[in-house]
Amino acid sequence: GVRFPQGPPFMPYFVYMLLSKYKSKFISYVGYTNNLKKRLILHNTSKGAKFTKGKKWKIIYMKKFLTKSEAMRDEYILKKDYKLRKTIKSNFLKK
């Protein structure tokens, strides 16, 4: 018969962008994770990334990937593409 690999169930990875208001301006943060809900909770507490501590964050963008390496590559691109980040931020703030 057909054998399937044993192990944990498949979990996709996400690239996400967060937005927070800080000293009267909006700032963004880009990251990747395989548990978006848990990661947002960590960012909104003292256990998040150093940059995100002490601020309240909202997810304004997310994209799903099948592998960690794809997510890491996309995260790197989004972190460096300030024009795209500004567009995502502007589109969210228009709502």
State each model region's role:
Residues 1-55, 59-62, 70-84, 90-95:
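GIY-YIG nuclease catalytic motif and its immediate N-terminal context
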